[in-house]
């Protein structure tokens, strides 16, 4: 479905009636918070929301990492909240490097490495309250949550994919949009992942940082890859082609193995008869630690 949205397949227009229903419900839901501000929880500490209006992966997590690190460098004490998509937990959960992938979901495992207080909850307002009750933070970053209108926010940042932009421009299910394009005119900043930019968009460029062996934790800089350049490439993210294109630029030869976003891997997914290394994203690696597969490496970006 994601490929159809961004390739602007004509058959999607048969879903237009459902799109009108989805758009009407989304608009009514947002208006209910605008008209009833008492329904909105306002945090005593400022909240920065990093989100998007489209489905299919735009690069929010790297931007959240960057903002958290920059705030820390400048003397602030940031905390994180997220939904913990795909995690099996109840209520509010504090995420640490020891919290398992099964509890948190895949993206939270990446953010857990930041060494800042981090809580997940399907109710982000509750996560933000718990965070402030337990930790001395002076700013909160919400990973996703642009549409979580029950939580007040001081700064809104929308991330878009520079190459795919907003796909066919239609709302779900005929297109990838959670909200209409006009919503972008209301946010404080639009960050464009990869370019080209339009208007006042801020360009974000992601660079490959390190190759890390999943079992041993051994790290190598991008120019010091210790194996030959033939690999099996795996990506279970919102936009697998972004990862595959990066590997091509780095000079790898590989077979493409795309999986759905948040895919739960099994041993068969990672079984190859040859001895070539398996190269995947950091997000995928978080879900594959328990396989103890010595051929798996992952590439970090920053």
Please tell me what each predicted stretch does.
Residues 260-264, 295-302:
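Short, flexible loop segments at boundaries between secondary-structure elements
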Residues 79-81, 158, 230-234:
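Conserved beta-strand elements of the Class I
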Residues 84-86, 237, 302:
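Residues in the short beta-alpha loop(s) of Rossmann-like NAD(P)-binding domains
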Residues 21, 61, 111, 143, ...:
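Residue-level signal for inorganic ion chemistry
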Residues 30-97:
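Walker A (P-loop) phosphate-binding motif
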Residues 1-46:
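A transmembrane-helix-recognition feature enriched in membrane-embedded lipid enzymes
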Residues 85-199, 210:
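Phosphate/Mg2+-binding loops and adjacent switch elements
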Residues 1-8, 165-279:
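C-terminal accessory "lid"/substrate-recognition subdomains
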């Amino acid at each position: 479905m994601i490929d159809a949205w961004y390739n602007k397949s004509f058959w999607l227009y048969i879903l237009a009636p459902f799109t009108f229903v989805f758009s009407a419900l989304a608009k009514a839901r947002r208006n209910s918070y605008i008209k009833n501000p008492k329904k909105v929880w306002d945090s005593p500490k400022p909240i920065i929301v990093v989100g998007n209006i489209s489905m299919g992966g735009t690069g929010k997590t790297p931007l959240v990492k960057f903002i958290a690190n920059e705030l820390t460098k400048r003397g602030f004490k940031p905390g994180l909240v997220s939904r913990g998509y795909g995690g099996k937990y109840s209520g509010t959960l504090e995420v640490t490097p020891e919290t398992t992938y099964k509890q948190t979901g895949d993206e939270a495992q990446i953010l857990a490495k930041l060494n800042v207080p981090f809580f997940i909850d399907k109710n982000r307002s509750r996560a933000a309250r718990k965070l402030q009750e337990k930790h001395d933070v002076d700013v909160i970053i919400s990973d996703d949550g642009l549409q979580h209108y029950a939580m007040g926010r001081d700064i809104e940042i929308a991330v878009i994919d520079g190459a795919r932009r907003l796909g066919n421009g239609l709302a779900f299910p005929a297109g990838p949009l959670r909200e209409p394009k006009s919503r972008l005119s209301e946010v404080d900043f639009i960050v464009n992942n990869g370019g080209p930019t339009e208007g006042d968009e801020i360009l974000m460029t992601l660079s490959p940082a390190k190759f890390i062996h999943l079992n041993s934790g051994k790290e190598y800089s991008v120019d010091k890859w210790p194996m030959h350049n033939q690999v099996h490439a795996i990506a279970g993210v919102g936009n697998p082609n972004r990862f595959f294109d990066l590997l091509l630029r780095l000079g790898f030869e590989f077979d493409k193995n795309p999986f759905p976003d948040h895919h739960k891997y099994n041993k068969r997914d990672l079984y190859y008869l040859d001895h070539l290394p398996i190269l995947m994203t950091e997000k995928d690696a978080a879900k594959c630690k328990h396989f103890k597969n010595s051929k798996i490496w992952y590439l970090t970006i920053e």
